[in-house]
């Protein structure tokens, strides 16, 4: 996407009345935080019962609702005060098995550096469908590595919390060998490889 295309894009959408990121009351923010939980419970239940198609469908919805909630938390839009938005990101990191602190860092840079080489998150938006799929496993690793490198001590400290929560989730799954937890770890790792497709490209 060249400079001309970026300018055209911004001009074309400058007058659009976007309906996302509407300011929320605290009660609405709490409800928003609850949206992924029924899908988490359903995916674990179906995995425990070995009904894999339904488990996969519930996991798909879990990841999509978690991505939506993550976006609201990144922009501080849930109506909470203090550090609450950050703790939402930490909780989602434990559930989604990635660092949402890193995602937040890259997403805010995406808004600032749209369409430039600094826009790592937006790079997938300039690829073909097959390129995005091929890039999938590398995309979250690149997002995390760059955030760790550029983010400074505060971002690295918050990323360390996220990654410790990831390790805890994986550790519990391996120690208990609970089928639904092992399934969750596997399906979330696959979902992380598809974030470039669902969160950026589509």
Whereabouts are the PLM-identified features?
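Non-catalytic, topology-defining segments of multipass membrane proteins
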Residues: 1-60, 93-197
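Acidic (Asp/Glu-rich) catalytic motifs at the cytosolic membrane interface
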Residues: 65-82, 103-118, 202
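Post-HEXXH active-site segment of zinc metalloproteases
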Residues: 79-95, 125-126
